[in-house]
Amino acid sequence: MTDQSHQCVIIGIAGASASGKSLIASTLYRELREQVGDEHIGVIPEDCYYKDQSHLSMEERVKTNYDHPSAMDHSLLLEHLQALKRGSAIDLPVYSYVEHTRMKETVKVEPKKVIILEGILLLTDARLRDELNFSIFVDTPLDICLMRRIKRDVNERGRSMDSVMAQYQKTVRPMFLQFIEPSKQYADIIVPRGGKNRIAIDILKAKISQFFE
């Protein structure tokens, strides 16, 4: 955990795929933005930092284990977090779930008072943990995560149910048990039941609001 005197406060939200991380992050962002303004709070998804695979064929790209820490460019993410803390803007990568690689365009992100960082593998990397002012683990039962993942990937990402189930059995569940669930020990706060846990969201809002005082 970092010293809170840093210009940019980084809050990490981790948990299984489809556990409700993005919902919690977006809810906190939306409700806190109404209080403090868009210029003071932002959200960065860890998914933006999947490694560039433009040099690989599509056949090779789809074989990537996206739930293993090696799929992430955590070195670039670390560099960007440190830049934001220094007060410098970053060029946020844009990742395509359809093309399975990083796009050419980037999005400029200016430093904010608070950045909410959310992703499945955040707490598996000690370097990233050291940059977080505090961290949250969203603890949702795997059967619920699977149902949400099927709905999301089929409806929003154009995948077949068979491919989603195959990936879940081959990599998603094993990687959760090997890497993600053990990283829960590093979280400062554990949130059960995902993004619809209103009491937990209100507690988190109160905690984050302290950084704006």
Curated annotation (Swiss-Prot):
Tell me one GO biological process term.
UMP salvage
List where in the cell it is found. Answer: Cytoplasm
Residues binding ATP: 15-22
Keywords of the record, alphabetical order, are: ATP-binding, Cytoplasm, Kinase, Nucleotide-binding, Transferase
List, in alphabetical order, the Gene Ontology terms for molecular function in this entry.
ATP binding; cytidine kinase activity; uridine kinase activity
Q: Which InterPro entries match?
A: P-loop_NTPase, PRK/URK, Uridine_kinase, Uridine_kinase-like
Cysteines paired by S-S bonds: none
Cellular component GO terms, alphabetically?
cytoplasm
Q: What class of enzyme is it?
A: transferase
Reaction catalyzed:
uridine + ATP = UMP + ADP + H(+); cytidine + ATP = CMP + ADP + H(+)
Principal location listed in the UniProt entry: cytoplasm
Return any one Pfam family short name: PRK
> What's the Enzyme Commission number for this chain?
2.7.1.48
Keyword Metal-binding appears in the UniProt entry: no
- What does the record give as its pathway? Pyrimidine metabolism; CTP biosynthesis via salvage pathway; CTP from cytidine: step 1/3; Pyrimidine metabolism; UMP biosynthesis via salvage pathway; UMP from uridine: step 1/1
Q: Which family does it belong to?
A: Belongs to the uridine kinase family.
Put simply, this protein is called Uridine kinase
Tell me what organism the protein belongs to. Escherichia fergusonii (strain ATCC 35469 / DSM 13698 / CCUG 18766 / IAM 14443 / JCM 21226 / LMG 7866 / NBRC 102419 / NCTC 12128 / CDC 0568-73)
Q: Gene name?
A: udk
